[in-house]
């Protein structure tokens, strides 16, 4: 699947977080996580490291306006598991 097609699907995923607390878009976090895991990331810190290393690439498909989220944020958002 092309990343642009993947982003079309990710971008319609509902975000149940409290809007006033959101710093990083859900679609950015999901794109980062998927790409990192496909590339061999095995934990939250690996995902963060992947993002820092590949930020220019990720920005071709996502906004990443506030950079890469820290691993605690990635873990918290992905672990919420309210994706339908």
Curated annotation (Swiss-Prot):
PANTHER family according to UniProt: H REPEAT-ASSOCIATED PREDICTED TRANSPOSASE, PROTEIN YBFL-RELATED
Additional information: Missing up to 300 C-terminal residues compared to orthologs.
InterPro entries: Transposase_11-like, YbfD_N
Identification of the protein by name: Inactive transposase YbfQ
One Pfam family, short name: DDE_Tnp_1_assoc
Gene: ybfQ
């Amino acid at each position: 699947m092309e990343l642009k097609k993947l982003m079309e699907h990710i971008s319609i995923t509902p975000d149940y977080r409290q809007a006033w607390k959101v710093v990083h878009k859900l679609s950015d976090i999901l794109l980062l996580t998927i790409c990192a895991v496909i590339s061999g990331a095995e934990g939250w810190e690996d995902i963060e490291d992947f993002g820092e290393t590949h930020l220019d690439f990720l920005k071709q498909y996502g906004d990443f306006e506030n950079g890469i989220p820290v691993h605690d944020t990635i873990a918290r958002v992905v672990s919420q598991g309210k994706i339908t």
